[in-house]
């Protein structure tokens, strides 16, 4: 079973016969398909692994992955976006600008519904092997600080303004509507309804609790690739 989406400036009467000819003529077996849980779950608890590899340019690459359960809701999706953007700004200030130890710390978030509701937060950066432990400590400390105190008013307002502007700009983008149609039919959630109201309502306390709830679940993976000791 397939769902086809058409987004953009399409003349319906012109498109109908083409859809009937090229899609309507496809064979069907009347089978309802669904996802398959391959049981490849992210490991629980705290896990750290550091290994060395010869490199032409000696570099340490550090990856943190935090995982846990969280309901698949529009508000949680928005909170995750707030959290990653705040962390991006904090790490730019505390790691890149103050320490000068990396070009940047990248934060990625993913809220999943299938095969089970799950929240992922990944933090990645590269640095001089001699600075890896110090910078990794700062990264963890700033994440814990966000979970304990929430973001500053300045960071909160910057993210809020950006998200509202991006939302307004997205109304004109076909790709945005394509993704939202997919979310609606696949996940059963309208990612546009009430979006601006939720963004405007987000507080520092909301973000603090969201990050704290993730860290309290105690699932942290830290993997470091560095160079052999000479």
Which residues fall in each region the model found?
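Glycine-centered hinge/linker elements that transmit conformational signals in sensory
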Residues: 18-32
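His/Glu-based metal-binding/catalytic segments typifying zinc-dependent metallopeptidases
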Residues: 31-90
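Short helix/loop capping segments that flank catalytic or ligand/cofactor-binding pockets
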Residues: 14-15, 27, 72-75
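Bilobed periplasmic-binding protein/Venus flytrap-like ligand-binding cleft at the lobe interface
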Residues: 23, 80-89, 138-146
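PAPS/PAP-binding and catalytic site of the sulfotransferase fold
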Residues: 4, 15-22, 139-140
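M16 family metallopeptidases and their MPP-like homologs
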Residues: 1-7, 58-75, 96-201, 219-228
């Amino acid at each position: 079973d397939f769902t086809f989406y058409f987004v953009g400036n399409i003349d319906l009467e012109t498109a109908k016969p083409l859809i009937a000819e090229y899609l309507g003529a496809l064979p069907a077996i009347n089978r309802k398909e669904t996802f398959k849980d391959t049981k490849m779950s992210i490991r629980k608890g705290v896990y750290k692994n550091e290994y060395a590899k010869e490199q032409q340019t000696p570099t340490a690459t550090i990856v943190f992955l935090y995982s846990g359960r969280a309901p698949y809701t529009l508000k949680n999706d928005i909170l995750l976006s707030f959290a990653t953007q705040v962390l991006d700004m904090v790490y730019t200030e505390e790691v890149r600008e103050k320490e000068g130890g990396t070009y940047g710390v990248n934060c990625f978030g993913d809220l999943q519904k299938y095969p089970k509701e799950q929240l992922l937060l990944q933090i990645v950066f590269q640095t001089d092997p001699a600075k890896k432990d110090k910078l990794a400590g700062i990264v963890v400390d700033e994440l814990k600080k966000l979970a304990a105190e929430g973001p500053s008013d300045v960071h909160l307002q910057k993210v809020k303004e950006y998200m509202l502007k991006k939302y307004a700009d997205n109304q004109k983008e076909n790709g945005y509507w394509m993704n939202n149609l997919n979310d609606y039919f696949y996940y059963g959630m309208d990612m546009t309804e009430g979006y601006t109201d939720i963004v405007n309502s987000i507080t520092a306390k909301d973000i603090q609790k969201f990050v704290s709830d993730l860290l309290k679940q105690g699932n942290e993976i830290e993997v470091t690739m560095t160079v052999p000791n000479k």
